[in-house]
């Protein structure tokens, strides 16, 4: 799976970063990275992870991933919720295999739930999406999960103690592309997971808002369509970060994820959990 793409240089607005989100809902013409690469079929391992469809002018246009953190609340990336008025509607598909759902990408199916509202961080802008890349989707109907299956938020500053190491492992989950290169695209709408490790934190172009994780054949990683999906801390249900951006159009090398352990992020998401 792959997120938005980013060039590893912190330009004035870092607009060269590629968001890993919003691949077109029609998999035949993907535009941004969206799936887990070199990953494993998830099955029912992470039932809180859902596929999100975003409509423009009433028609399905893009897709992302997200995590159910309360029965009617889905956590995702800011660029998946968009700026005010950017999307006319959102819905989720809460099944592991959306590829064979005959209702996709339209509403009304047994595994779809329509959104009543969606919000990105109040400081989010598309032009500098990576700085405040978190959003929520509010659902019209509850997702049925057991209490231990919902994604949970980290404590403030929890990730600061992490050290770049092959032993600092995350579980990335999403519905993004499995492979993309100049001659081949594999874009099955199936929930998958990978186990990337921490490459960079609190330094370089990631700043204090992102982590850089591995993305290779050994660890797997994210791609277009995985945007907004969770990067769980180890094998826990704690969502350390949401998939945000990629470094290149092939979804290879490293991937950027937006940290959730910052106070302003926790305050923003927390208001929808009260």
Write out the residue ranges for each language-model feature.
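Sec-dependent bacterial lipoprotein signal peptides
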Residues: 1-18
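C-terminal subregion of chymotrypsin/trypsin-like serine protease catalytic domains
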Residues: 20-35, 48, 52, 63, ...
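Chymotrypsin/trypsin-fold serine protease catalytic domain
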Residues: 23, 131-219, 256, 262-266
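Conserved catalytic-core segment of clan PA serine endopeptidases
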Residues: 33-44, 58, 88-159, 204
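Short Gly/Pro-enriched turn/cap motifs at secondary-structure boundaries
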Residues: 40-42, 125-128, 186-187, 219-224
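Short, hydrophobic/aromatic-rich segments at coil-to-beta transitions
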Residues: 44-51, 168, 210-211
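Short beta-strand segments that buttress and anchor functional surface loops
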Residues: 51-55, 214-216
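Solvent-exposed loop/turn segments at secondary-structure junctions
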Residues: 74, 80-82, 124-125, 142-145, ...
């Amino acid at each position: 799976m792959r997120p938005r793409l980013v060039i590893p240089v912190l330009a004035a607005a870092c607009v060269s970063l590629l968001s890993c989100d919003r691949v077109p809902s029609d998999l035949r013409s993907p535009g941004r990275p969206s799936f887990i690469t070199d990953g494993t079929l998830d099955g029912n391992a992470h039932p809180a992870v859902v596929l999100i469809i975003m409509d423009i002018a009433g028609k399905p246009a893009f897709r992302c991933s997200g995590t159910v953190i309360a029965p009617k609340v889905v956590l995702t990336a800011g660029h998946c919720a968009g700026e005010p008025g950017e999307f006319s509607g959102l819905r989720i598909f809460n099944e592991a295999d959306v590829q064979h759902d005959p209702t996709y990408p339209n509403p009304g199916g047994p595994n779809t739930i329509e959104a009543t509202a969606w919000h990105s961080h109040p400081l989010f802008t598309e032009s500098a999406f990576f700085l405040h890349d978190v959003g929520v989707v509010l659902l019209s109907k509850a997702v049925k999960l057991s209490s231990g299956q919902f994604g949970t938020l980290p404590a403030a500053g929890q990730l600061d103690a992490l050290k770049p190491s092959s032993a600092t492992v995350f579980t990335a989950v999403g519905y993004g592309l499995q492979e993309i290169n100049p001659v081949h695209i594999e874009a099955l709408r199936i929930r998958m997971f990978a186990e990337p490790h921490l490459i960079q934190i609190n330094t370089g172009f990631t700043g204090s808002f992102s982590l850089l994780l591995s993305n290779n054949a050994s660890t797997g990683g994210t791609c277009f369509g995985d945007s907004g999906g969770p990067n769980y801390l180890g094998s826990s249900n704690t969502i350390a970060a949401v998939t945000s951006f990629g470094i290149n159009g092939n979804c290879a090398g490293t991937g950027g994820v937006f940290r959730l352990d910052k106070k302003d992020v926790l305050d923003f998401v927390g208001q929808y959990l009260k």
